[in-house]
Curated annotation (Swiss-Prot):
GO terms for molecular function: 2-polyprenyl-6-hydroxyphenol methylase activity; 3-demethylubiquinol 3-O-methyltransferase activity; polyprenyldihydroxybenzoate methyltransferase activity. S-adenosyl-L-methionine binds at residues 44, 64, 85, 129. Pathway: Cofactor biosynthesis; ubiquinone biosynthesis. It comes from the Bacteria. Signal peptide: none annotated. This is Ubiquinone biosynthesis O-methyltransferase. Pfam families: Methyltransf_23 (PF13489). The keyword Glycosyltransferase does not apply. Belongs to the methyltransferase superfamily. UbiG/COQ3 family. Its EC number is 2.1.1.222, 2.1.1.64. The gene is ubiG. Gene3D superfamilies: Vaccinia Virus protein VP39 (3.40.50.150).
Length: 240
């Protein structure tokens, strides 16, 4: 099956890059701006492990890796991990933290589209978590991820649904009321409906295998997974 060539080789929003560069030094501060990422990471990792059948000894690419939270956790599970990002400061933080912990992760500053041209079908697993809503052309990212994975391999995406409830919870609630993330972290116009993401996936060699919601309960201050995908969700696809 043919995979569409990515149409946006320089698929970068400089304002988004600068936004995360400004707070990159606090990426591994468990009480800082990235606390939610640290708290949901076990849920993300377990989902990847369960749906892929395990990642030990597998070649994994983490697209939009930022400071390396997910990348390091996958490397701890025995995967050969490459983290990909366009932010200079987040990658410096990621490399330093990997040196401090002794966890081997290879970090590369490059767009996923460029990486796909160099390394087609090079990875057993590709993850693209909380990244699609921060680029000008998310469909191009999906196509590139499809190019990068081997036949039979797995690609995982996570993003935010686009509807009024998601705007209220992910922007108004998380940024302005609960102050879980900095104001301006999200642009609701860039949120992505599951039907849109699945449509992009269906135009590649990938097929959607499973979708699940990621929920936050402000009363219990707990994150959990569930069937409701109204706000945050994760999607598992496979090269078939």
């Amino acid at each position: 099956m043919n995979i569409k060539t990515p149409s946006t080789p320089n698929n970068v929003d400089q304002q988004e890059i600068e936004k995360f560069e400004a707070i990159a030094s606090r990426w591994w501060d468990l009480e800082g701006e990235f606390q939610p990422l640290h708290r949901i990471n076990p849920l993300r990792l377990n989902y990847i492990l369960q749906r892929s059948g395990g990642i030990f000894g597998k070649k994994v690419l983490d697209v939009g890796c930022g400071g390396g939270i997910l990348s390091e956790s996958m490397a701890r599970e025995g995967a050969d991990v490459t983290g990909l990002d366009m932010g200079t400061e987040p990658l410096q933080v990621a490399r330093l933290h990997a040196l401090e912990t002794g966890i081997p992760v290879t970090y590369v500053q490059e767009t996923v589209e460029s990486h796909a041209e160099k390394y087609p079908q090079a990875y057993d697993i590709v993850t693209c978590m909380e990244m699609l809503e921060h680029v000008p052309d998310p469909q191009s990212v999906v196509h590139a991820c499809a190019q990068l994975v081997k036949p039979g391999g797995h690609v995982f995406f996570s993003t935010i649904n686009r509807n009024k409830k998601a705007w209220l919870m992910a922007v108004i609630g998380a940024e302005y009321i609960l102050k879980m993330v900095p104001k301006g972290t999200h642009d609701a116009k860039k949120f992505i409906r599951p039907s849109e993401l699945i449509g992009w996936i269906d135009r590649t060699s990938l097929r959607e295998k499973h979708i699940i919601g990621l929920h936050y309960n402000p009363l219990t201050d707990k994150f959990s997974l569930g069937h409701n995908v109204d706000v945050n969700y994760m999607l598992h696809s496979q090269y078939v």
